[in-house]
Amino acid sequence: MWGSTCIPRKVYQGLYPLKRHFGCAQAQHFLVFCWLLMALIRDPGKGTLKGLKPYLPPTLKYWTTVRMIRSGQWDVEAVVCDLATATLRALPPPADGVLYLIGDSTVKEKRGRKHPLGRMTRHSEHDPYTFGFEVVLLIASWEHRRVPVALALIDPSCRGHQNILFRQMLTDFVPPSWARHVVVIADAGFAANATMRLITAKHYGYVFAMPRTRKFTNGKHLRDLVQHLPKSCSYRRASSKPDGRRQDYWVFVRHATLHKLGDVTMVLSKKRRNMGPKQVKIIVTNLTGATAGTILSIYARRWGVELTIKELKSGLHLGRMQVTNDKKCVTRSVALSVLAYLLLVRLYGADEAVMQDWSLFKLKEHFIGEVAQDAVQRTERKWQHKLKQFKDVA
């Protein structure tokens, strides 16, 4: 694969507002940062620092990129926040003014056992145990658009760190000016009491899956209702997926008062009428006047964060860089993939012809083509200038 010797003007201008976060001018960390994002987008391989060398200029050595990632002179959280804010402002707003904040966690498997944030874990009781580190991701979504706005790594030595990080993300997030209503969507792992109080205090709506251990005000658990609910109480309702396809569920709707949560609308849903209690999903919301189909359609948007995680892992090599055993260094290396995603959305998010299907891989193809075209045009201008000099001398 051919290399590049110059950062395209469009990329440099898109990242220039972040230059103030890179304090070490002597080491030119901002330029190294720009090159690393471009290399992550262009690299189809494993995404390691040594694997990115063919996509970097010959003068940029391996140890220069390592020192930049290890350096503590740039705040990765502030860089992600500023680039996400600029990206949200550059995209066209929805007609209804509703912004959805979707949170989820994922596990990045690692083979080495000395990872500073690694631990043995599994996705569910039916999956095998794997060793890796966990990442919490928060995205902003509306219509067909998905924009990562915050990222953090879970420390296994801190109890309840996942919900602590999620609350910090919600606290730090500043909605764009066009957002008239914000709805938070997450699964049962994020439904902590402190998180629900924070969402209520910020006057956000929420659509959460609830664990069966949650209690009513009379002391009974949700699992008691799910276990003994007759099939005759469920009725069929249609919902829509984010891509517009229809999905029918058998639902039971009830207005209830939950312990430490207050008055909510509770939806018990299952895909088939004859499914048992274990296949029932409990969804709770504070949206007043929302029908069962609307609640299910909103919760279906949670699939957007799953797609974003898949794109980050397969397309932008999330967590594949081999760095030291420093936790902050690992966080910086993981955040580079999210920053590369934001760069692509920042450059092409407003172009409806490119963003019609909202596919990261199509954005990568478009970016690689533009970088190649820019390199060819720059080489052509250089040789035309030299030819003109030869003619003037002759």
Labelled PLM ranges:
Residues 36, 280-303:
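Extended, non-catalytic structural segments that build the interaction scaffolds
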Residues 107, 295-323:
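Short amphipathic alpha-helical "interface-anchor" segments enriched in bulky aromatics
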Residues 318, 322-373:
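Basic, amphipathic alpha-helical segments enriched in Lys/Arg and hydrophobic/aromatic residues
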